[in-house]
Amino acid sequence: MKKTIFTGSAVAIVTPMNEEGSINYDNFADRIEEQIAGGTDAIVVCGTTGESAAMTDEEHKECIRFCVEKVAKRVPVIAGAGSNDTAYAIQLSKEAEALGADALLLVTPYYNKTSQRGLVAHFSAIADSVSLPIILYNVPSRTGVNISVETYKELAKKNNIVAAKEASGNISAVAKIAAETDLDIYSGNDDQIVPIMSLGGKGVISVLANCLPTETHEIASYCLEGDYKKAAELQLKLLEFTNDLFIDVNPIPVKEALNIMGKNVGECRLPLIRMEDAKIAKLFSSMEKLGLTK
């Protein structure tokens, strides 16, 4: 029986930046405390939302170390350690394990356009290099490669590959993964928490939780309790805002939203830039309806 890393809601936490572009660790500490106080069940550091692709090696390690220290075992810390370079992904994974992370989130290799056999070889090599439990992250809209159900089945044979973060948007594929593997499944899309959890998913790895940790936790909790009616009502209440968090490339809108809320997380690093005024106005409007504007 594979160990479940968490049930409920995990936040794919943003990395706050100072005006000149350095990481704002004081603000980062505040965001971590806010998440734990809001009921978040796990924290994913150095993921897509955390701008890991724009970090140096040292920053990546320091963010993981800092998060592990501040969380202090109150909830699991899941470290993003994926790369399109297998050797580098192994290095990141070993470093995350040494720094005290509780689990790893490994995105599929991007840009290389490897085959399904290549995905098996890539993830197997990483799994063999560490003892931490691993969540595979499937987000073909960003990486250009999709993990097939057959590949999931093959990778599930590895003892420490325990879960999938599914952001493909393909509910039929999620159903097959649930039916044909023993992997825990987490929704990687905030607008699909209820359908994925109704198929046996264990929770969500969420962008929305950066702004609404309690509500995101409640949606997942209702699902875990079997109250899909309440879960759906809350998910639909937040749907316009949820959609507007992806009105531009993640994490541009969620950082804008947090700044509108007065959290002062700064802007994204280049090559990501602040979105256009019309998009900001649309985001502000959906936030205003929920009472989230300062």
Residue ranges and their predicted role:
Residues 2-11, 15-144, 152-154, 293:
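Active-site beta->alpha loop and helix N-cap motifs at the rims of alpha/beta catalytic domains
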Residues 80-88, 167-168, 186-191:
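Glycine-rich beta-to-alpha transition loops that act as phosphate-gripper elements at the mouths
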Residues 85-96, 174-175, 191-199:
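Catalytic cores of alpha/beta
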Residues 28, 60, 64, 89, ...:
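A general structural signal for well-ordered alpha-helical segments in protein cores
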Residues 104-105, 136, 159-169, 183-186:
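Catalytic beta/alpha-barrel core
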Residues 197-294:
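Structured C-terminal cap/extension of enzyme domains
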Residues 100, 130, 180-182, 199-200:
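Short, structured coil segments at secondary-structure junctions
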Residues 102-106, 183-189, 203-207:
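Short hydrophobic/aromatic-enriched beta-strand-loop microsegments
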